[in-house]
């Protein structure tokens, strides 16, 4: 699960742990209130004014305000993996969710301990959910791999795809040997 999807995946795991062989989270929401999060300031490690000034501003706004890596390759990944969801997004529904998008209970309080393979990837320059709050998840996931990628923001898989691909491949390999709880 990515971002809010990370909170939803944790909820599914808490409700049905016997049906889950493992969990991978990229920049998961931990604190539902933005004001309570420990977040980084937005930093662009690889600025590219030639690219960002030449793009339609309505398409590039989120890329510019969230992207740490603003290379042509990162823009292509953003177009392929992020923009389609943004285009299909129901803005009114998102506004309602943003006002209260948390679940009734903290998933980890319901879950307790989960010993399956877990991957948590965060970006050190993530100004949306940060990387510090996710460390509070670790006592609940004793077999977790926790990685904070430098030069990566909220879209760590866009900013540092090779690192994320390697981590996910390792997690998938662990999944092959993980019995269902």
Predicted regions and their residues:
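Short alpha-helical segment within the catalytic ATP-binding CA
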Residues: 3, 7-8, 155
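Residue-level signal for the nucleotide or nucleotide-sugar donor/cofactor binding architecture
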Residues: 89, 129, 159
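Conserved serine/cysteine hydrolase catalytic core
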Residues: 92-139, 148
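Short aromatic-enriched loop/helix-cap "lid" or pocket-rim segments at secondary-structure transitions
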Residues: 34-39, 132-133, 159-161
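Conserved alpha/beta-hydrolase catalytic His-Asp/Glu region
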Residues: 34-39, 54-113
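Catalytic active-site module of serine/aspartate enzymes centered on a nucleophile-bearing elbow/loop
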Residues: 144-181
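Conserved alpha/beta-hydrolase "nucleophile elbow" surrounding the catalytic nucleophile
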Residues: 1-3, 123
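Flexible "cap/lid" loop of the alpha/beta hydrolase fold
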Residues: 10, 14-53
